A protein has these predicted regions:
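A short glycine-rich, Lys/Arg-flanked "PGG" loop and its adjoining helix->strand segment in the class I
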Residues: 1-10
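Conserved class I S-adenosyl-L-methionine
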Residues: 10-38
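Short glycine/proline-rich turn/loop motifs
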Residues: 38-43, 102
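Acceptor-substrate binding/catalytic loop of class I
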Residues: 41-57
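Conserved S-adenosyl-L-methionine
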Residues: 55, 59, 67-78
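A C-terminal cap/extension of S-adenosyl-L-methionine-dependent methyltransferases
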Residues: 71-124
Length: 124
């Protein structure tokens, strides 16, 4: 995408967040912290079949690639963990939940608490 984007053009990038996957996997396997497929010292997930990035690593990858980051978004937050509960919500509660999600999804202190990160960048 960067090769065909003009200087100053906008590009969206999506990453799988390394750090929140642990809680998602723990939801499926109570023993994930002892038998999960990750480095037990660094907490780096093994990049198969997906590639995982921390927020910092994603930022560095974009900066090193000549991308100026304009927005950073925790795309789904805890929604995957709470999917069953969210599906049970009334329309009124769901509307308020979405308002809450949009309220917190760009807070820097919560960017790592999501399975998916979305970056909006600009080609330098």
């Amino acid at each position: 995408a960067k090769r065909v984007c003009k200087d100053g053009g906008k590009i969206f990038f999506s990453f799988i967040s390394n750090d929140f996957v642990f809680l998602t996997e723990f939801g499926y396997d109570v023993n994930y912290f002892s038998n999960g497929d990750y480095d037990k010292e660094t907490f780096k997930l093994n990049d198969f079949p997906f590639v995982f990035h921390t927020v910092g690593a994603a930022r560095k990858l974009l900066a090193d690639g000549g991308i100026n980051i304009l927005h950073e978004v925790a795309s789904d937050g805890a929604s995957e963990l709470l999917a069953a509960r969210i599906n049970e919500m009334s329309d009124e509660d769901y509307t308020q939940y979405l308002r809450y999600h949009f309220y917190i999804c760009e807070k820097p202190e919560l960017l790592g608490m999501t399975n998916h990160l979305l970056f909006m960048g600009e080609k330098k």
